[in-house]
Amino acid sequence: MDALDDRVDRFLLGGAQEQLAAGHPVGHDLEGMDLFDEQWERNRELIESVLDERGDAIRLASDLAYEGEDGGRAEVAVEDIDEKREAYLDVGAATVDGYEPPIRESDAVFVKGALGVFEDERFADGTVGVLDAIAETDCFSGVGGGDTSRAIGMYGLSEDDFSHVSIAGGAYIRALTGEPLPAVEALEAAANR
């Protein structure tokens, strides 16, 4: 997000790291989760800095979904979470409803990653709801990442409803942020021989 500076008007986020940086006790249990712990510590300062500097352009999920006692989907407002009790597996319906208007008003929308554990139908609502909203617009839409493109196929959406779909999420982000792409550089060098 930091590399995109003023080129982006609005960020609609569903990730646990951003919620943690904003002071909400969500995310994975960090005990025994070395990979998540390392990722969080590596990104913490950057995320907190971006939230501080661009907070007016960033919207975080307002509610989250988890597995209720009956095994079904349950939702809770983020503001009502005072301690980590559940594994939050998707954004909630209010978040999707809140994200739809800015998506529909945009000239361009870029998506990287799913908003929930979409492989489990109970927790696909966030991912599918946002992808549906994007698919219904006339704006330029870029979708990046293997999971996101897989969700398109799993839930009956058509890649034709999006301007660009990439299964290479990392390369997609590097291209958006202007970082060099080694494969493209190699092709350019070969073409100039």
Please annotate each region the language model reported.
Residues 1-193:
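Active-site loop-to-helix "anion-binding N-cap" substructures in soluble metabolic enzymes
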